[in-house]
Amino acid sequence: MNIQALINDKVSQALEAAGAPAGSPAAVRQSAKPQFGDYQANGVMGVAKKLGTNPREFAQKVLDVLDLDGIASKTEIAGPGFINIFLSEEFLAKQADAALADSRLGVAAEEAQTIVADYSAPNVAKEMHVGHLRSTIIGDAVVRTLEFLGHKVIRANHIGDWGTQFGMLIANLERVQQESGEVSMELADLEGFYRESKKLYDEDEEFAVKARNYVVKLQSGDEFCAEMWKKLVDVTMIQNQRNYDRLNVSLTRDDVMGESMYNDMLPKIVADLKAQGLAVEDDGAQVVFLEEFKNKDGEAMGVIVQKRDGGFLYTTTDIACAKYRYEELGADRVLYFIDSRQHQHLMQAWTIVRKAGYVPESVSLEHHAFGMMLGKDGKPFKTRAGGTVRLADLLDEAEVRAAQLIESKNPELDAEEKEKISKTVAMAAVKYSDLSKHRTTDYVFDWDNMLAFEGNTAPYMQYAYTRVASIFAKAGVAMDELQGDIQITDEKEKALIAKLLQFEEAVQSVAREGQPHIMCSYLFELAGQFSSFYEACPILVAEDEAVKQSRLKLAALTAKTIKQGLSLLGIETLERM
C-alpha cells in the first residue's frame, strides 16, 4: 500500500470539503523528523492564500473534516499551517503483517502502460567504454522497476550500426579476407582493425574511393556489403553481451533496435516534412526552422534533416525512431537514457515530431539525462595514459579489488566461494556507486569509496542483508515459518515499520522520475533503521515468544525488502560474506 497516496487522497477530500477549489494539491510528504509525525500535509497554506484566509484557521477547518479513522492516532497543526499526521500503531502493525504475507511486499501493480526504454546504445566495431556505463545501468534499473509495477516495457538498444565508417570497415575486411581467407575476430581485434581502416582511408586514395562506393552499395542493399556489415555487428554484440551478463543487465540481442532499422523511413519522413511545409530547401539541404530555438543572432534555428548530397542525419533518424515507437510499438511513454549533452538535439527532434503530428502530446517523450563519470582530478575518467577506459577493463579491476577485500575480511572461505562472492560484490559496487548518485550530476569515480563497508555503498547494503538473514540461521527458523501478529512494544519498532511501509513510495518514485538513487537512499535509511531497532530490541532473547516472533517478522520483512530493492537495481544479494 502507498500510504502517502492514501493520506494525500484523504487530505484532498478534506480540503475540498473545507471550501478549497476542486483539485487543490494536498502536497502530502514524508515528515523530515519524527516530532513532525510520519507525514505532513503542506498544501493548506497555498490554498489559504488563494482564498485570502488565515492558514492556521483554514488548517483547523480541514482537520475538522479530515477522516483518518483507523489510520492516524494524532493530527496537529504546526507552524504557519502545516498538518502533521501520526500513524497509529495498530494501522502500522496491520500493514506490516499484510506486506510480509504478500510476495510483492504490499506493492500494488499499476495500470499497465507500454513503455519503450532507450538505453545503453554502444557503437558497432568499437568496444564499450566507461561512457556507456551510466546509460546501461540507470536504464536497466528503471526498466526493472517499471516491470515490477506491471508495465509492458520494450527495451530498445539503439546501437550505432550505420554510417559512412562502415564503407572503410567493409573495404578493409574484404582486403584481409582476400589476403588470409576467412576472418575470425574478437572485438579487441576490431578496435585495432578500425584504426587500421581509418589510416588506410586517410592515406590511400584508391582505398578511400572503394570505401565510399561501399557506403553507397551498403545503403542500396548489396548482398556482399550486407554480409560484411552483419559480421561486424555480430562480433560487436557478442562482446557487448559479455559486459551485460557480467553486470547483470537484462539486455539481450533481441533488444537491439539499431539506427539501421529506420533507414527505409528516412526518405519518406523528409518527403512528408516537405509536403507539410515544415522542411524547406536551404543552400541545397532540407531544413526545418524552429522558432522554439534561436541561434546566436536571435533567429529561428535551422535543423538539417537531409544534407545537400542526399544523406540523412542523426536528427532524421531520431524523428523516424520516435514515430516508429508510437505507431508500431504503441508506446505510452518513451524514456531516453542519454547523456545530458544531447538534450538540445533531442528537444529539436521531438519538436519536429510534435509539429508533424507523428507522436501526440498524450505520449510522454522523456529525456532522462545523466552527468559524467569523473576521475579524482575532476576531469572525465581516463586511463593513466589519458585514453578511454574500456568497460571490460574496469570490471576486471573491480573483481581484483573485490577479491582482495573479501580475502582480508573472510580468509577462511574456500576458493570457489571467495570467487563467487568477490564477483558479486564487484559488480554490485560498480553499479551501486553510480546508481546511488543523483542521475543528473557528474560524480567522481573512487575505488576506495565504492568498496567500503561503511556508508551508502553496495558492500554495506549487501552485508546489511546478510546480517539480517543470518538471524534466522541462529534462530533455526525460516522466514516463512513465523507465527503470530506483529506488535509494537518500542518506538524503534514503530520507526522501522514506518520506514518499511515506504517501500512502495520509493518504487513508484523511481518509476515516475527515472531516478534510481531514490531507491538507494531508501534502502540505506532502512538499513540504518534496522540497526537502531536491532540494538534496542532483543530478538533471539526477547522477553516472551510473541514478542520474539513479532521481531523476527520485522527482521524478515526487512531482509525481503532489501533483497527486492537491490534486485530492482539489478544487484544480487549474498547469504554469506
Curated annotation (Swiss-Prot):
Cellular compartments annotated: Cytoplasm
Entries under PROSITE patterns matching the protein: AA_TRNA_LIGASE_I
E.C. numbers: 6.1.1.19
Cellular component terms per the entry's GO annotation: cytoplasm
A Pfam family of this chain: Arg_tRNA_synt_N
Span(s) of short sequence motif 'HIGH' region: 122-132
UniProt main location, coarse: cytoplasm
Disulfide bridge positions per record: none
GO molecular function, one term: ATP binding
Catalytic activity: tRNA(Arg) + L-arginine + ATP = L-arginyl-tRNA(Arg) + AMP + diphosphate
InterPro entries tied to this protein: aa-tRNA-synth_I_CS, Arg-tRNA-ligase, Arg-tRNA-synth_N, Arg-tRNA-synth_N_sf, ArgRS_core, DALR_anticod-bd, Rossmann-like_a/b/a_fold, tRNAsynth_Ia_anticodon-bd
Keywords: Aminoacyl-tRNA synthetase, ATP-binding, Cytoplasm, Ligase, Nucleotide-binding, Protein biosynthesis
Transmembrane segment boundaries: none
Protein family: Belongs to the class-I aminoacyl-tRNA synthetase family.
UniProt xrefs under PANTHER family: ARGININE--TRNA LIGASE, CYTOPLASMIC, ARGINYL-TRNA SYNTHETASE
Full protein name: Arginine--tRNA ligase
The species this protein was found in: Vibrio parahaemolyticus serotype O3:K6 (strain RIMD 2210633)
Record lineage: Bacteria, Pseudomonadati, Pseudomonadota, Gammaproteobacteria, Vibrionales
Gene from which this protein is expressed: argS
